[in-house]
């Protein structure tokens, strides 16, 4: 082999080694401290070796060049020695502030992350989440919640659906395993038909059969103070969605469709400041609205928009 070929292979091997050492550090920080590490907005949790290297390649869109994974490894290793409170830390933005790669990383982190050390903020509590409905939106939400189940944030406890014939739970588990856009579920799914549960990786999901929101007692399943995510779209006004709040164990309702009447339609990053602590029912608007609004707002704020046309393509 030529010297250039050998050098490229050696460089790739070093990146692989750094990525292999990074992966358990990222996972441990999430499970033990509820610290989610990202790289310019992209989560590093549960990345493969190649995925971790690709994430550093992606950084060139922000830095003008690929981010050195060795620097990230030094930063994350130092983070592991800090007693951090729950936080979301963007390593890309953090490293941008590191003028000298050879600087004292411990001192740098102590200054930059002074607000998230454990002594200043206790570890957060988990919050029960129930998916009312298990269509495509519900299943994609389930994937996200399952993927992030190791921390102390949202914890998927149950799904509520109508029974649809024999082996209903088996069919629903099969749909969770496969998605036409996002592909196969990354992990293990085990169905317990006798107890009506689905275990997805380490998350035990109770399947509750009900025809109406007002029929469910969540406390009977050990679920309390839960956020009910209604992804059926059947009830969209305050009167209909309030049925969820009448159930023991439910405290908040999030609708994944456009709300009607006085229900606030919220797009995160655009108008989420409108949410008040006293709001018990909020709509996350539609898929289309969430897809177009952030981009449209940025364009409108910068250049102005006179009119537009939107087309949507649905998957299953």
Where are the language model's segments positioned?
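N-terminal Rossmann-like NAD(P) cofactor-binding subdomain of oxidoreductases
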Residues: 2-316
């Amino acid at each position: 082999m030529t010297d250039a070929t050998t050098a490229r292979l050696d460089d790739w091997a070093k990146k692989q080694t750094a990525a292999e050492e990074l992966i358990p550090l990222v996972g441990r920080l999430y499970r033990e401290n509820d610290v989610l590490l990202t790289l310019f907005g992209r989560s590093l949790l549960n990345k493969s070796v190649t995925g971790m290297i690709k994430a550093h390649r992606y950084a060139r869109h922000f830095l003008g060049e690929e981010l050195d994974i060795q620097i990230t490894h030094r930063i994350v290793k130092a983070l592991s020695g800090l007693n951090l409170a729950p936080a979301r830390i963007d390593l890309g933005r953090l490293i941008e502030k590191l003028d000298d790669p050879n600087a004292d990383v411990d001192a740098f982190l102590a200054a930059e992350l002074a607000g998230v050390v454990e002594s200043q903020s206790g570890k957060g509590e988990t919050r029960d989440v129930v998916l009312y409905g298990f269509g495509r939106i519900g299943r994609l939400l389930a994937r996200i919640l399952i993927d992030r189940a190791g921390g102390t944030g949202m914890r998927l406890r149950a799904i509520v659906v109508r029974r649809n014939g024999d082996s209903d739970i088996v069919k629903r588990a099969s749909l969770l395993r496969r998605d036409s856009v996002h592909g196969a579920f990354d992990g293990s799914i085990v169905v317990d038909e006798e107890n009506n549960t689905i275990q997805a990786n380490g998350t035990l999901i109770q399947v509750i059969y009900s025809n109406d929101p007002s029929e469910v007692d969540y406390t009977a399943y050990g679920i309390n103070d839960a956020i009910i995510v209604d992804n059926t779209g059947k009830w969209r006004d305050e009167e209909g969605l309030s049925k969820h709040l009448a159930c023991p164990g439910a405290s908040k309702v999030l609708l994944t469709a456009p709300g009607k009447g006085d229900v606030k339609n919220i797009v995160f990053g655009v108008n989420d400041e409108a949410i008040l602590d006293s709001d018990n029912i909020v709509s996350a608007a539609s898929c289309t609205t969430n897809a177009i609004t952030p981009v449209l707002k940025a364009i409108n704020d910068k250049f102005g928009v006179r009119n537009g046309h939107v087309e949507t393509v649905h998957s299953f």
